Each structure stands twice: as structure tokens, then as C-alpha cells.
């Protein structure tokens, strides 16, 4: 919205002109024509000149490719050489991680030293855990001959129980009969 502006300029508001407002209205229309022509001048699509892409020397690019290719080949050869040393059952297989639970070739858990008190042999078949019931110190599974010989040393025969404390069978049986007779109504 345009507001009329009072001016002391005689060219703008002269004594021979009827009113400044009419002149302003005409000038405003002329100005809009100017704006529209200037707007079309600036609003046309700008055509950019196609930029020429500058390429580096092809010698440098091939040089970079050969050096990177060589470094990859060298890394692969080093990995193959490392895997040659891992033959047999020692260590963990190549391609596995330490978190997979493989023990080192010494038989102790990973991350421990010999000074930590781990024996070189785990004392139980490989692949079993301590929770499987194998004793680590004697190196034999439970139920072995030594355990049977200990029972023989205790002096129990085949007719007696291995449990040294007497069981109270009579009391438990009578208690069950009493509770069952109270719950069941007599048939008589």
C-alpha cells in the first residue's frame, strides 16, 4: 500500500497540477510497469556456461591405483603367512575372535598369565565346562575309580546305606497315616 508523501519539490507537486495524489497514482502505475519489465529482466533463467572439468594427470591416478593395489596384496600375503603358522590344534582357528571362547595354546583362559595359577592342562576334556561336574585338580571325571575306593574305605557294606545318619521312616509314615485318616472319612 502506497502513502502520499508531502514534498517541497516543485517538479513533483507544482502549482499548475491539480493534486499530488493523482500524480502519485500515475507515477505509481508507471513505476509498476518499470518494475515488471525489470523483474522480467532478472527473473529469466540464468544459463550457466558449461564448466570444463579439470582432470588430474592420468599418470597420477594410475600411480595411486597401483600403490593401493599393492598395499592390499601385501596385506593379503601377510595374512596368509600368519595363517601358515596356525596349523594343528594349537590356538584358535583363523577367522575367529577372542570372544568366541577359544583358549590359548597353553590351556588357560585368554588374557591370563601363567603366573595367575592356571595349569597348562585344563584337567577335563576340551569343550566341557567346570559346571559340567568335572573336577579340575585330579584330572579325572566324577565317578572314577578313586571315588569308589574312598567309599570302600569308609567300611560300609552292600547291605547298609552310605548315609551315616539314621533315617526316621517310622515317624514319617505314621504322620502321613494320621493326616490321611483325618482327611478321609471312615468307610465304616
UniProtKB/Swiss-Prot annotation:
Basic residues bias (residue ranges): 80-92
Domain of life: Eukaryota
List of residues that carry Phosphoserine: 37, 121, 180
Pfam families recorded: DUF5568 (PF17724)
Coiled-coil boundaries: none
Alphabetical keyword list: Isopeptide bond, Phosphoprotein, Ubl conjugation
Sequence ranges of Polar residues compositional bias: 1-10, 94-107
Signal peptide segment: none
Family: Belongs to the UPF0461 family.
Protein name, entry field: UPF0461 protein C5orf24
Amino acid at each position: 500500500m502506497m502513502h502520499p508523501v508531502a514534498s517541497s519539490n516543485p517538479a513533483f507537486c507544482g502549482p499548475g497540477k491539480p493534486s499530488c495524489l493523482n500524480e502519485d497514482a500515475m507515477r505509481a502505475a508507471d513505476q509498476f510497469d518499470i518494475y515488471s519489465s525489470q523483474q522480467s529482466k532478472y527473473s529469466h533463467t540464468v544459463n550457466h556456461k558449461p564448466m570444463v572439468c579439470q582432470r588430474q594427470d592420468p599418470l597420477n591416478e594410475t600411480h595411486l591405483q597401483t600403490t593401493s593395489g599393492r598395499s592390499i596384496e601385501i596385506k593379503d600375503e601377510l595374512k596368509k603367512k600368519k595363517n601358515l603358522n596356525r596349523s594343528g590344534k594349537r590356538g584358535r582357528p583363523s577367522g575367529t575372535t577372542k570372544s568366541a571362547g577359544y583358549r590359548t595354546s597353553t590351556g588357560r583362559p585368554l588374557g591370563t598369565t601363567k603366573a595367575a595359577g592356571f595349569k597348562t592342562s585344563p584337567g577335563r576334556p576340551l569343550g566341557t565346562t567346570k559346571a559340567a561336574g568335572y573336577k579340575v585338580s585330579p584330572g579325572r571325571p566324577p565317578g572314577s575309580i578313586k571315588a569308589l575306593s574312598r567309599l570302600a574305605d569308609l567300611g560300609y557294606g552292600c547291605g547298609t546305606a552310605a548315609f551315616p545318619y539314621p533315617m526316621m521312616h517310622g515317624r514319617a509314615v505314621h504322620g502321613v497315616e494320621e493326616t490321611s485318616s483325618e482327611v478321609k472319612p471312615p468307610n465304616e
